Amino acid sequence: MSNWSSGRSLTVTREAREETGLAVGLAANQRQRVQSKTSGLQMPGVIYADSADKAARFILDCNQTRLPLIFFQDVSGFMVGKDAEHSGIIRSGAKLVNAVSNSTVPKITVIVGGSYGAGNYALCGKAFDPRFIFAWPNAKYAVMGPAQASDVVFTILTRNPGAERTPAELAALRAKIKQDYVDQADIRYGAARGWVDAIIPPHDTRAVLLTALACAARPAPKAGFHTGVLQV
């Protein structure tokens, strides 16, 4: 394994498997706090501008060298706030999404924890056509977290001035909305609707990925690799 970039909120590596003869590129977000040289302390499960930029260049490199890509997701999304905007999160995030969405090499995604919002897209969610999407049994798959989503839906439903409800009714409505969202974020809900290809035991991940790579890496894709305009 050659460590292409670590010490960031996203880690990308090249790895060669002697038993299969396959080399692959791995992209995964960190689930621990990281001390970045450029932007200080970075929180776990969030994509920052420097790591998005580095990952985008790594994905471009894998496409040039025709390396299959494996993404591991446990991500809440991109970092927000004034400091994140000053660091160029919009430009770097767009570059990462551009690189992932236009990749022509085989892509495989494994959801090992949460997969929320734009982070799902950045690490090759369903919309960007990975050859396979696998998930661990504990995985969550949604636009945003249950607390935030239930607040948004609750506000919309109670905005009608003609609908008068007692405090008890409002509390019951909020609780129902949140529970519905929790149920629908469960990976079994998504798997039943074809959002993932299989729910796999964590200890079988290696064997499943080796089989998936053997299926996905051949034949070589014929499409050329072309990205949109990238801001540098």
Please place each PLM-identified region on the residue numbering.
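Ligand-binding clefts of soluble mixed alpha/beta catalytic domains
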Residues: 1-232
